[in-house]
């Protein structure tokens, strides 16, 4: 970093980082992780679009969350390709290795928007589960509208938040890579990281409560199906109860993973920003390249979504088979009553 309008030459310590084979290997490893995550994101989105085993709004939230991942990973790929290009073709020009922060704004904004977007979409999923639990019969009938409205609102919140983080920052400093956070915006970014951690913790607590409520509702429906084998047994209500429970379990599981991702990202970023001044450029570069958590989260989240969808599908098949058995038992019971009446 440097003062405005003054081009910066890389220091000998900076050149040590660029010439390090370990650092170069770490950059290619980052690219491998990023391209792998993009492949998994595409697979997960395709699975969400083709398998309607969870409600439409939940699928929409998951897709928007994956798009936030892809936004981050696209910017991350551009960032890593820039550094690799510097290493391969510009090491003989040490005074042309730094970037003006303004020229990096789209990459930096995309990295931040991808991270914060995943947090805001987590809020949308939590709100959706609350309303689904409160309005058990009404909410599923709204189909995709809750997803459209809540996703649009959270995207707006995310855009506003990113603008606030970089508010009044002229972006005139020079940075060694486009992943380097502009110094005038670091304070607001760290403040948001603290808020994001509390948000994720609140999501976890709320989802635990919702999961408990859905378990109670499902047990009540089971009790009805066990003691009422007549035509008054509402198969649709029983099925909706099971779907709500399994969807809540799935969202709870995904929220757990996202909470862990947010927690690790927050802790890592705060530690990194605190310790970075005492690190050499090589130590700082290797630490960021190997332990930055978001690329790993963007591999884990689509993988968990695909595993969870498979789990829900299998559970739904079991629930349908169980309900069919219960319906047949009820029909047999009514046939017995009819035979007795005809005698």
UniProtKB/Swiss-Prot annotation:
Residue ranges, Extracellular side: 1-24, 82-106, 168-192, 269-291
Chain segments annotated as transmembrane: 25-45, 61-81, 107-127, 147-167, 193-213, 248-268, 292-312
Example of a GO MF term: G protein-coupled receptor activity
InterPro entries per the UniProt record, alphabetical: 7TM_GPCR_serpentine_rcpt_Sra, Nematode_rcpt-like_serp_alpha
Keyword Lyase listed: no
Subcellular location, record wording: Membrane
One Pfam family hit: 7TM_GPCR_Sra
Keywords: Membrane, Olfaction, Receptor, Sensory transduction, Transmembrane, Transmembrane helix
Membrane protein topology class: Multi-pass membrane protein
Role summary: A G protein-coupled receptor required for olfactory imprinting a requisite in ordorant response such as benzaldehyde and isoamylalcohol.
Name of the featured protein: Serpentine receptor class alpha-11
Species, as recorded: Caenorhabditis briggsae
Organism classification: Eukaryota, Metazoa, Ecdysozoa, Nematoda, Chromadorea
Gene that produces this protein: sra-11
């Amino acid at each position: 970093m440097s003062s405005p309008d003054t081009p910066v030459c890389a220091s000998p310590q900076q050149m040590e980082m660029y010439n390090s084979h370990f650092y170069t290997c770490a950059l290619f490893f980052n690219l491998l992780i990023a391209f792998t995550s993009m492949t998994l994101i595409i697979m997960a989105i395709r699975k969400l679009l083709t398998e309607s085993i969870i409600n439409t709004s939940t699928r929409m939230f998951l897709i928007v969350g994956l798009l936030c991942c892809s936004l981050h990973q696209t910017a991350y790929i551009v960032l890593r390709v820039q550094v690799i290009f510097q290493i391969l073709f510009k090491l003989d020009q040490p005074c042309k290795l730094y970037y003006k922060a303004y020229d990096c704004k789209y990459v930096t904004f995309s990295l931040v928007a991808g991270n914060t977007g995943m947090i805001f979409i987590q809020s949308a999923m939590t709100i959706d589960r609350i309303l689904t639990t409160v309005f058990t019969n009404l909410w599923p009938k709204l189909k995709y509208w809750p997803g459209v409205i809540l996703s649009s609102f959270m995207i707006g919140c995310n855009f506003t938040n990113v603008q606030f983080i970089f508010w009044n920052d002229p972006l005139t400093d020079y940075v060694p890579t486009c992943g380097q956070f502009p110094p005038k915006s670091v304070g607001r970014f760290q403040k948001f990281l603290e808020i994001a951690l509390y948000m994720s913790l609140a999501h976890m607590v709320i989802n635990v409560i919702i999961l408990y409520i859905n378990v109670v509702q499902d047990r009540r429906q089971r009790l009805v199906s066990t003691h009422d084998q007549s035509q008054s047994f509402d198969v649709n209500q029983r099925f909706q109860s099971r779907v709500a429970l399994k969807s809540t379990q799935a969202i709870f599981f995904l929220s757990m993973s996202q909470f862990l991702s947010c927690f690790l990202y927050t802790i890592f970023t705060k530690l990194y920003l605190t310790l970075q001044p005492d690190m050499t450029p090589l130590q700082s570069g290797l630490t960021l390249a190997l332990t930055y958590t978001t690329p790993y989260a963007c591999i884990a989240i689509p993988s968990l979504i695909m595993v969870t969808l498979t789990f829900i599908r299998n559970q739904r098949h079991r629930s349908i088979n169980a309900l069919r058995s219960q319906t047949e038992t009820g029909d047999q019971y009514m046939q017995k009553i009819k035979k007795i009446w005809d005698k």
